[in-house]
């Protein structure tokens, strides 16, 4: 009996040792402009590692506020470089974990107007609604304001500006024709059929360096660390470039 019991115990332990390791999960806060590439990267990450990245999309400013109020995110993919650095400075992210994963490009886009000569379109002002993301919460919104000020049209266009909570909502306003045109991320209109766009010259706004950070809740989590490492790798970079982002 004792030998049989010992053998059964050994078989049980061996079976447990041979079971595949349970896949990990990481909760990732993703700036809305990066939604589509993030989905592709997460799918490939799961295929390569077995780990799952659970993605939430929104405005970087809103995410930062949630992170400082104990939200369960483990990784932060911001649309700017300031908030990830602030997260480290305030003790909400791991020191040394911040890096630039993409450099965003701003476009003026419309479903109904020819905006290919964007500066002329903005100066003429022959439209009733111009969509931008909330500049206080979304870096692409701040870049839109900076662009309009550089062109000397901001004051004249202010009454026509409608603000989305995020760049995702700003895109939706234009896509659904609730605004005739709007400033959105190049990544959002890559591959979108129809419409007209003007790629805003980089000289008109501060480069949109989008930084990632390993948050305090993910500092000891293997899946969170693995996701950020994958984000820095060649397969993820190829996806990022395909959506129109620059790399550093």
List each model region and its residues.
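Sec/Tat signal peptide C-region and signal peptidase I cleavage site
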Residues: 19-23
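Bacterial N-terminal signal peptides
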Residues: 5-17
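Exported/periplasmic ABC-transporter solute-binding proteins
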Residues: 24-57, 61-71, 77-81, 85-91, ...
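N-terminal secretory signal peptides that target proteins for export/translocation
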Residues: 1-2
